[in-house]
Amino acid sequence: DALPISVYCGNQVVNTALDVEKMKTKSPGIALAMKAQYPPVDKTYPVPRDLGKAIIKRAVEDEFDVTASMEQPTNAKGLIGIGHAFGFICRRILRDRPVPILPILLNTYFPPNQPTAKRCYAFGQSIGRAIAAWGGEHADKRVAICASGGISHFVVDEDFDTRVLEAFKSKNVQPILDEPETMFRSGTSETKTWITVAGLLSET
């Protein structure tokens, strides 16, 4: 299912172990990428459910229809992993340390129900307001935000990338929000995760 916006609110989330046999069937580049996202053994991360619920509550108040996901999906082999967008962060940034994480999922890729760039920015603002309110009640906690994904790909568009980076640098994202949605196709759609974070940071 391709849900436009989802917030994971289960008790924990698992980055499942590398499937070595599956990796052997892949091209060298894909095999290398798999090592960068899957740990040698399953790694479990606690989820700050109260923060997730606060983000959902605020999003509903801001007129977003948000899915609350409570369990990781399974198949005949067992638990399905959290995907490379999160697995890469867990491996390369968190270094498999059991830091609490709250996965927020955007369907930037699969038609026909991808949120627009403007909608992603507004959702980011909603997340920012939710975190600010939650932080007021949890002064001993710190929240770090991490987007995942590239800018233009699989065809590289240097002009587009420059416009995006300059918009973030100048804190004037309106030109990017005004880009036609046809610019946010295929892998380039992942730019919307960074646009969401830009919206969040506008509330800090």
Predicted feature descriptions by range:
Residues 51, 123, 160, 189-193:
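Catalytic-loop motifs flanking and including active-site residues across diverse enzymes
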Residues 114-164:
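Active-site beta-strand/loop microenvironment that shapes enzyme catalytic pockets
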Residues 46, 174-204:
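Polyanion-binding loop/helix "lid" in catalytic or ligand-binding cores
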Residues 57-66, 94-100, 125-142, 170, ...:
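Secondary-structure boundary elements
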Residues 155-182:
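Metal-dependent phosphoesterases centered on the DNase I-like endonuclease/exonuclease/phosphatase
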Residues 7-111:
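His/Asp/Glu-rich, glycine-adjacent segments
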Residues 2-3:
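Short, small-residue-biased leader/transition segments that mark boundaries at the very start
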